[in-house]
Regions:
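N-terminal, active-site-proximal structural segment of metallo-dependent hydrolase catalytic domains
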Residues: 1-83, 87-94, 98, 255
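Extracellular/periplasmic catalytic domains that process cell-envelope and extracellular macromolecules
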Residues: 30, 59, 94-97, 123-125, ...
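Active-site beta-strand/loop signature of hydrolases that rely on acidic residues for catalysis
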Residues: 20-48, 70, 104, 132, ...
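Metal-dependent phosphoester-hydrolase catalytic domains
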Residues: 109-120, 133, 155, 162, ...
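Residues that flank catalytic or metal-binding motifs in active/ligand-binding sites
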Residues: 53, 61, 97-100, 126-130, ...
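Active-site-proximal beta-strand elements of phosphoester/diester hydrolases
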Residues: 1-10, 113-115, 140-149
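Short, solvent-exposed loop/turn segments at secondary-structure boundaries
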Residues: 46-50, 154-157, 237-238
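Beta-strand-turn-beta hairpins that frame and shape the catalytic cleft
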Residues: 97, 101-113, 124-145, 252-255
Length: 255
């Protein structure tokens, strides 16, 4: 959300959370959501008016939820970023809130795991993923939701995905790996796709599908990869403007 003033911030964010909840249930721009993955899910920061986004959105949706905070270091100034990433309102250096990743689900979440990712390029924003298991009928499915560093070169991003891939190899369950991979160049898209496909994952999203935008740029940042289950339908929920990302969605068939 690009907001310039703290005046009225709590009410504005409350309305945005409610708008997102409606979009995820009314079935117009995307099917009714059963599992929702959030990245940059703020928890009582000034920029979100003190709201806990994951908790409040889960309450409106009637979902179970799990959130892992990034653990942003206090008082550490952010490093200079690429110009196309510099529009984001930063979290205040002394803000007592935090951001993070979250999973929301209509089914109970089991075996919730925090996964810390190696991060070098952006010393003020630790990177992480969250994993959890849901039971669809008699079949368990493991879900990994990651927020990859946009500042890192391809090798740095793949090093983060390697940590997640190692975690996925520890389970024999069908697996979904998704999130904001910040593949903000065609080369990053290609190498990320090749990395996961080499490990048995598939995705229906064509390389270059716009999911993130500024006023002048549209890029493919967000992905859903699966192994052991099948994606039957998929899409990008445009023009749902509750974030600088358009939500991506997939209907997954579990045998």
């Amino acid at each position: 959300m690009g907001l310039m003033s703290l005046s009225g911030r709590p009410e504005h964010v409350r309305r945005q959370i409610s708008a997102a909840a409606r979009a995820f249930t009314e079935g117009k721009l995307l099917p009714r959501v059963d599992v929702l993955a959030l990245q940059e899910a703020d928890m009582r920061t000034k920029r979100t008016g003190g709201h806990h986004v994951a908790e409040e959105l889960a309450a409106e949706l009637g979902m179970h939820w799990a959130h892992e905070a990034a653990g942003i270091p206090r008082g550490v100034k952010p490093v200079k970023r690429q110009w196309w990433l510099d529009f984001e309102e930063p979290i205040d250096l002394q803000d007592t809130g935090d951001t993070g990743v979250a999973l929301l689900s209509r089914l109970p979440l089991k075996d919730v795991t925090r996964i810390d990712l190696p991060w070098q390029e952006c010393q003020w924003r630790p990177r992480l993923a969250i994993a959890a298991t849901i039971s669809v009928g008699t079949q368990d499915v493991r879900i990994f939701n990651a927020h990859v560093d946009p500042h890192a070169a391809v090798d740095g991003q793949l090093a983060q995905l390697e940590v997640i891939a190692t975690q996925t190899e520890a389970t024999t369950l069908p697996t979904i790996v998704l999130g904001d991979f910040n593949t903000l160049s065609r080369q990053k898209c290609i190498e990320t796709r090749e990395f996961l496909e080499a490990r048995g994952y598939t995705t229906p999203f064509p390389t270059g599908t716009p999911t993130w935008r500024t006023t002048v740029l549209k890029m493919h940042a967000d992905w859903i990869f699966v192994r052991g289950v099948k994606i039957e339908r998929w899409g990008v929920a445009k023009p749902l403007n509750v974030s600088d990302h358009w939500p991506i969605w997939a209907e997954v068939a579990v045998e």
